[in-house]
């Protein structure tokens, strides 16, 4: 074995250790200064379990969002006293002791609105304000107004919000962008991280880390002042994602951090709890029971961690795409997450430089460079010719191509020759008449074929453009916009996901009905409208014919789903 080179390499190796120790202190400080609200399954114990198992409501999220009318301990005591009495009615007990969430009023757009006018009209409809909440409410208060996705999603969601904010910025609502960044900074200061959403039952996990990109977006309007203002919160979020790294040995994992055998540091998705999700209680219990060969707690953790990924659920996490109970999210190192961590490190370097701390900036650059090497070494499948996730159990890069493979291009972490191969793979395997497929596998899960999701369309479009692959990028935008326009023309709404095997149809699959609104679709649609139309002639609807200045590629024929990986 070679001895380590003296001097500079040893010194550089110390940098991450120093910075991680500082971050560990930040993480502890955040935990010590906040009181974590308890989720409803803990507050209500057996009552929560009994109500959810009784399936009193079509959507399990309904009772998770219900507000106790008095101290939960008193309600629970009353329940224990009454539950075995003759004639006890559980539904009546719930109606007396809880305030159920109200269904949002169905928005009816004015006649004759263009697509752009419809989206601009929706921003105030989707805006919420919860500076104060009821004492035992699962909803977490936020100091500023925020935009929700829509439908059953009555709270703000972490990674959704970035793509919503792109649209808000496109509409000139920089005040709303600033408010939402302030809200997420507030959550970092109070909870040590940004939860999945502002609900107590989401506090045990985060979502794809877009906060640094949100600050970077705000800096387009406010300049470096935004970077300087939110540097402390960006550092705290980084500490959350890297928590435990200082004690890791090669080949070990701790929470969200993975240390491979050669010392490479990467990240994975993780939820701190290993119980059924309150918002999907019955479904999770059924999934765990369907595979008696695995501990239920292991399945619960992997279900929760998949929710943390934003891809809940997908064949991407499963050994058998037709069986959800084979998912093992925590043993997979995701290419999209590590691309976002690379971007976070780059933005932290930029923000450190903005405050004049060049030494700290260099440390972040060192971390980003190390992660980029890790992405190229472990998250590139050379045999297939695309980026993919790394499997901690097989110690190999996985073979499946997913839309997550475009994230290294989105954050400018990809090697140029590999970006070219990604363009070919995308066009060959994922591009459909209605946009970009999430995967090429039909599993019945919502983050699989034939569904296409707005954030992935934008990541692919921007990522490919970053590397000069404009033709494929514009193909994706044009196909997806056509899908959105056709659906809007028919139904007068934008939806959460789309069937990309055709145009004009919303997506299916998953644990709940198709939702409309819809925050991230609105944001991406506005960005794409302004991408395909000349600035001197902005369009309010998708043009009937594709602009000749862009690619002249003909619409693709529908592809059959590819074999299960």
UniProtKB/Swiss-Prot annotation:
Kindly indicate where the leader peptide sits in this chain. 1-30
Q: Name one GO cellular component term.
A: periplasmic space
Q: Pfam families given for it?
A: Trehalase
Enzyme Commission no: 3.2.1.28
Kindly list the GO molecular function terms attached to this UniProt entry.
alpha,alpha-trehalase activity
Cite the residue spans of the region called Disordered.
539-565
For this entry, the protein name equals Periplasmic trehalase
The protein's organism comes out as Escherichia coli O45:K1 (strain S88 / ExPEC)
Query: What lineage does the source organism belong to?
Result: Bacteria, Pseudomonadati, Pseudomonadota, Gammaproteobacteria, Enterobacterales
Name of the coding gene: treA
